[in-house]
């Protein structure tokens, strides 16, 4: 099962980034006091997770695994601003408590009284992949259902800082939350079956990456020509001139597209 809160992102000309369209949280998070104490990203993530669970009994959830690249930015910014404004004295601890990255998974567990495995991954670009790998291992160990999701928010301050550092070249910044319910057995309306997952980081040549991809596919009984869709993190060419790292990354994607997956439909997502 899968739910997301950014089906129709707000692309208002007043904002330089995509902003998630949020649901009416009163319909999902009934406790008004709890809802008021939640920051925007916490409400977004908790609502998405609760919707994904649907009518599934909390006792059947074997774990809640969440992932985020940057965490609760609004609360983090609020706490740091208070720190500066009050010269490190008389600080309200609430923004700090709410800014911890495991808040969303913890709130879902508290609302439904789920006394099970609860983990949060903050590995920047590898956060969701790490959470998904953990969920798959929990399923292999015997868990029947694992709730796994990822969420990130974008703020004006964060956007300006990332833009000045050159981190948004060729990227259309955005935000959102997504949750998936992984099950050992297919339910009535399964979206897909996960056959395999592999991650590798560090500096690798195109040949090394190609070899690992080929071996990964072969372990799952597939060849490159069997892949119908190829999704990469390729950036816009016109936006990365002068950025050596991004040019190298794009050249690797292009090599894979032109040599390994010539028969695949290709698209990029960033």
Language model segments and positions:
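Short aromatic-hydrophobic micro-motifs that form the base-stacking/packing surface
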Residues: 147
